[in-house]
Amino acid sequence: MQLSEITKYLEQLAPLAYAEDFDNVGLLTSHTNDITGILVCHDALEEVIDEAIAKKCNLVVCFHPILFSGLKKITGKNYVERAVIKAIKNDIAIYSVHTALDNHQNGVNKIFCDALGLINTKVLIPKQNF
């Protein structure tokens, strides 16, 4: 399967327009086209990238973006830099859904509300135009 097909599906599931302005969602790293395997995780930490390498997965779909605010340097001195370097060196794409999924009407918050048996729920601060 092609990366573009998977990102198209993910963007239908959690449209990037739903994300908060401060967030960094979507395709964060990519130098690949044919996807050999997908690893899904909460945070794309260095250990997750190691697992993706071991399992021959070249796409990591994570909830939180590993690149949240701009990197000023990439020296490998912290876990973010090491994870990004390792992903790029091993041709692993990283895709984050974070607030795009948070803000979806059937997303993370609805799942939690349903699991807790809550009724009459509503979005406290709805995103404009949705």
Q: Where do the model's predicted regions map?
A:
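Hydrophobic structural segments
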Residues: M1-F130
